[in-house]
UniProtKB/Swiss-Prot annotation:
Gene3D superfamilies: Nucleoside diphosphate kinase-like domain. One of its GO terms (molecular function) is ATP binding. Belongs to the NDK family. Homotetramer. ATP binds at K9, F57, R85, T91, R102, N112. SUPFAM superfamilies: Nucleoside diphosphate kinase, NDK. The lineage of its organism: Bacteria, Pseudomonadati, Campylobacterota, Epsilonproteobacteria, Campylobacterales. The keyword Metal-binding applies. This is Nucleoside diphosphate kinase.
Length: 137
């Protein structure tokens, strides 16, 4: 069964919409195989987003991701990567379709409520970043 990583970002955690977001996953056939609430260190955020290191938004992204706790989850289901990306909506909430997580809960392109793996290969890497195999059920 396909797995993907989801991060509920600090803006959505602060707003108290964790349960509403998790319900979207479960209501659409994604099972929560692992989950934890963590406060990322600057080093962890830099390592997780290392692929964006040379991009102009990197510093702001890292600062945002350490501004409060996040909820990381492993979602499992048929076509989990694409299904999660469809549920999240466009990166910019102004462009996200009505009814998507970002359209409903995101503030801006920076504070956009959620992160989701963009491929099966990255899902594997991202899941291993946060979870040991014995933490996924």
């Amino acid at each position: 069964m396909e797995k993907t990583l989801s991060i509920i970002k600090p803006d959505a955690v602060k707003k108290g919409v964790i349960g509403k977001i998790l319900d979207r996953f479960e209501s659409n056939g994604l099972r929560i195989a692992a989950m934890k609430k963590v406060q990322l260190s600057k080093e962890q955020a830099e390592n997780f987003y290392a692929v964006h290191k040379e991009r102009p938004f990197f510093k702001d992204l890292v600062e945002f991701m350490i501004s409060g706790p996040v909820v990381v989850s492993v979602l499992e289901g048929e076509g989990a990567v694409l299904k999660n990306r469809d549920l999240m909506g466009a990166t910019n909430p102004k462009e996200a379709k009505a009814g998507t997580i970002r359209a409903d809960f995101a503030e801006s392109i920076d504070a956009n409520a959620v992160h989701g793996s963009d491929s099966l290969e990255n899902a594997k890497i991202e899941i291993e970043f946060f979870f040991k195999p014995n933490e996924i059920y």
